[in-house]
Amino acid sequence: MKKLIFLFAFSIAVTNIFAQTDPNQIKKEGNDAFNAKNYPVAYAKFSEYLKQTNNQDSATAYYCGIAADEVKKYAEAVTFFDIAIQKKFNTGNAYARKALALDALKKTDEYVATLEEGLKVDPNNKTMIKNYGLHYLKAGLAAQKAGKAEEAEECFKKVIPLDHKSYKTNALYSLGVLCYNDGANILKKATP
């Protein structure tokens, strides 16, 4: 009798350990956690769901990326936003959020490349326009302060085509200052 009870208890334990939770239930739990802004739980549930479904749900991948970003798992966020981009779900915002995650990882070249790629797909995405313009304005000002006029000029010229009035104005103003300073330096060298 003891062996029978032990065998019964053992089989129940093994069944519970190896039983797969229903993916739809996991997704629902992830959605509930996400809506409650409980991002660690949402990330765990969404990533488990995506693992079970072989990353087939682009919307869940996008929201898992947001949850990963919120819990500062930026590398994982990039991976999930890539899935959303590949499956063409909310592409513009997926590019914008991927870029922000790359920026948090201090991968500046990939950050800029992602913004450029994203702007080709969604040229009116305000977040990408803002981040791209701000990046090149800061880079141009840093180059200008370092005495690298040509590099600064290139940075400012990348901002001008953007549809952001204040960034465009700042870039044009900075280009004007750059030209003025260049002229002043030439004049200074010409007069003894």
Task: Tell me what each language-model feature is.
Residues 24, 58-59, 93, 127, ...:
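Start-of-helix register in tetratricopeptide repeats
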